[in-house]
Design a protein with these regions (language model features):
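Concave beta-strand-loop units of leucine-rich repeat
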Residues: 1-7, 13-33, 39-54, 60-80, ...
Length: 191
């Protein structure tokens, strides 16, 4: 379990915060102490976050990076991110040794996003992320990194006309048979 973040709750004018990885950050991280930091525009968290709801009031956030999401069990809800409509950069890394399922639909309203990096990996047989169609609304995206196990369909990316760079890794390249929906993207990396 990570160090409690409650001592930060009175720093209401804080605009940038980086919570580095420490030996205390090996388990799930309770980010409840961040709820009152409504002036934050830039947040980087290097510990396992399973509940994103404490972030829902941080509506000034323009850059959010969540790393080290190891050993998350079952499904993880991104629902707490849907009110962060000023986000321009979003990075989320979630990994699990068992089956992990993440619904991407809460991201559909984040239409100011220009950079999105989703690394969602699971040892389960189903897709690690569902509802890739939610990304089709993100028409300002210029850079997209998808390291998501077992995705098969890139057609939701067809309308992302501003996309300049796309990096896709599915854990098994044969899962994607049709790359034509991203023919318009100048730089595509299949890995």
């Amino acid at each position: 379990v990570c160090t409690p973040l409650d001592p930060l709750k009175n720093l209401t004018k804080l605009e940038r915060l980086r919570l580095p990885n420490t030996s205390d950050n090996v388990g799930a991280c309770d980010i409840q102490g961040l709820t009152g930091l409504t002036s934050l525009t830039d947040l980087e968290v290097n510990c396992t976050v399973q509940d994103f709801s404490p972030l829902q009031n941080l509506t000034k956030l323009q850059r959010l990076m969540i790393y080290k999401g190891y050993s998350i069990e079952g499904s993880t809800s991104l629902e707490g991110l849907k009110s962060l409509t000023n986000l321009r950069e979003l990075t989320i890394n979630l990994w699990d040794d068992e089956a992990l399922s993440v619904d991407l639909s809460p991201l559909t309203g984040l239409t100011k996003l220009q950079y999105l990096d989703l690394e969602i990996q699971s040892n389960g047989s189903g897709p690690a992320a569902t509802n890739l169609s939610a990304l089709g609304n993100l028409t300002d995206l210029r850079n997209l990194v998808l390291h998501i196990d077992n995705i098969t369909d890139l057609s939701p990316l067809r309308n992302l006309k501003k996309l300049q760079t796309l990096e896709v890794s599915t854990g098994n390249q044969e899962t994607i048979t049709d790359w034509s929906p991203v023919d318009h993207v100048p730089n595509v990396t299949k890995g």
